């Protein structure tokens, strides 16, 4: 069995895979992986991989050192089963790389746009030949709500929950619709633009806010909350065969 660890800006996700199948997912602090001893006792783990968008804490490094098996710390030097065309691979978020690896593995031979709606929203494109072309980063939903409140004098902090009209008729609904509809139109714009050159484009939607948009977008969307974890497992399996 494989141990997959994805440390994000907000939380850490730990997953167990058995022969390519996702068995269980755990969520916890991104500063300490206290559930590791429990996972090691519960599952016959043989190998692992970790990807992090933040600097690993000393606590986590010590916890990883005590694991009874080898664990790969994913970096731009780790072999991956796609061609990475990013000009500064050392600055590329490993979660973004893992997501396109998963998309290419799940839908081989297809042009794919991966939208990851988390702390930030990332748009990453991998073509049918498995070449990753790069992508863009924009503010995530919570970041947008927070920015409107912090960087203005009178705009209130608004919850994402509530009415989302096409045109806000109060400051609260104007902010909520501005953020959520704005993200919806942003996503649709990227999809429409890519479809001009890649008419058979497929779209994967993942991240903490993915299910806010999977039914709003008109294109065929594959919503997969665990896309990054699947990509990390694919990378681990690929390296195990080298």
From Swiss-Prot:
The active site is at 95 (proton acceptor). ATP binds at residues 6-13, 119. It is an enzyme of class 2 (transferase). GO terms for cellular component: cytoplasm. Substrate binds at residues 86, 93-96, 171. Its EC number is 2.7.1.33. SUPFAM superfamilies: Actin-like ATPase domain. A monovalent cation. Ammonium or potassium. The keyword Heme does not apply. It catalyses: (R)-pantothenate + ATP = (R)-4'-phosphopantothenate + ADP + H(+). Signal peptide: none annotated. InterPro entries: ATPase_NBD, Type_III_PanK. Catalyzes the phosphorylation of pantothenate (Pan), the first step in CoA biosynthesis. Homodimer. Belongs to the type III pantothenate kinase family. HAMAP family: Pantothen_kinase_3. This is Type III pantothenate kinase. The gene is coaX.
């Amino acid at each position: 069995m494989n141990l997959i660890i994805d440390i994000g800006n907000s939380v850490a996700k730990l997953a167990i895979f058995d022969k390519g199948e996702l068995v269980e997912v755990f969520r916890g602090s991104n500063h300490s992986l206290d559930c590791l001893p429990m996972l090691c006792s519960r599952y016959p783990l043989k190998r692992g991989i970790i990807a992090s968008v933040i600097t690993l804490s000393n606590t986590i490094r010590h916890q990883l050192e005590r694991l009874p098996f080898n664990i790969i710390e994913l970096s731009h030097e780790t072999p991956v089963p796609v061609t990475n065309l990013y000009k500064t691979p050392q600055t590329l978020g490993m979660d973004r790389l893992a997501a396109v690896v998963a998309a290419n593995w799940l839908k081989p031979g297809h042009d794919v746009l991966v939208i990851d709606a988390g702390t930030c929203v990332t748009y990453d494109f991998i073509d049918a030949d498995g070449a990753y072309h790069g992508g863009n980063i924009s503010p995530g939903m919570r970041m947008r709500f927070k920015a409107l409140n912090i960087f203005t004098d009178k705009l209130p902090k608004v919850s994402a929950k509530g009415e989302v009209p096409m045109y806000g008729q109060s400051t609260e609904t104007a902010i909520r619709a501005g953020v959520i509809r704005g993200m919806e139109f942003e996503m649709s714009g990227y999809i429409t633009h890519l479809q001009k050159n890649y008419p058979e484009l497929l779209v994967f939607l993942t991240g903490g806010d993915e299910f806010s948009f999977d039914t709003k977008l008109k294109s065929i969307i594959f919503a997969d909350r665990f896309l990054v974890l699947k990509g990390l497992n694919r990378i681990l399996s690929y390296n195990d065969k080298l």
